[in-house]
């Protein structure tokens, strides 16, 4: 455990310092250790915002491998999925891997729970190791 995290997530902001995660350019997406107020989730599906997915798909000329490259590139550079053209992100579905100490017993979530995020990927620290599938018809990546 890394220690106490900010209630607003500013502890994850790398650039520029002192602002909230959504307008930030770069977030720390190192998930090896989490802060006491965080939940680490193994993401299974990214539901990419429609405007963002359409823009990425057009930039890639519809090529699935290029779509993967663009999405992986955004996340690698920014530590989150915030499309630099549209400014939008999306949401995820996944399984809770670890719950921070400050949340244990206080929030109705435990390791192994399947969850869907209710906040945008444009402010959520995200690390993608691999994109297995692109579902162009429903704006999803797996």
Please report, for each region that a protein language model flagged, where it lies by residue.
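Short glycine/threonine/proline-enriched tight-turn/helix- or strand-capping micro-motif at secondary-structure
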Residues: 17-30
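A conserved mid-domain beta-alpha-beta active-site/ligand-binding segment of alpha/beta enzyme cores
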Residues: 10, 14-18, 79, 124-128
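Short peripheral tails and domain-boundary helices/loops at the edges of structured domains
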Residues: 134-142
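A generic structural signal for short, solvent-exposed coil/turn residues
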Residues: 2-5, 18, 33-35, 88
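Short, Lys/Arg- and Gly-enriched loop/turn segments at beta-strand edges
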Residues: 52, 121-133
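Short amphipathic alpha-helical segments
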Residues: 55
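Glycine-rich beta-strand-centered segment in the early N-terminal region that forms part
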Residues: 32-47, 58-122
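A eukaryote-biased signal for short, well-structured alpha-helical docking elements
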Residues: 1-13
């Amino acid at each position: 455990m890394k220690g106490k995290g900010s209630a607003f997530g500013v502890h994850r902001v790398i650039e520029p310092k002192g602002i909230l995660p959504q307008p930030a350019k770069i977030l720390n997406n190192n998930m090896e250790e989490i802060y006491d107020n965080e939940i680490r989730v193994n993401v299974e599906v990214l539901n990419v915002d429609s405007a963002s997915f359409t823009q990425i798909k057009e930039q890639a000329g519809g090529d699935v491998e290029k779509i993967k490259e663009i999405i992986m590139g955004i996340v690698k550079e920014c530590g989150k999925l915030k499309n630099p053209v549209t400014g939008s992100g999306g949401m995820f579905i996944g399984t809770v891997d670890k719950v921070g100490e400050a949340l244990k017993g206080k929030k109705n979530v435990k390791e192994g729970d399947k969850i869907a995020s209710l906040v945008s990927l444009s402010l959520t620290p995200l690390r993608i190791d691999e994109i297995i599938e692109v579902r162009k018809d429903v704006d999803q990546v797996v």
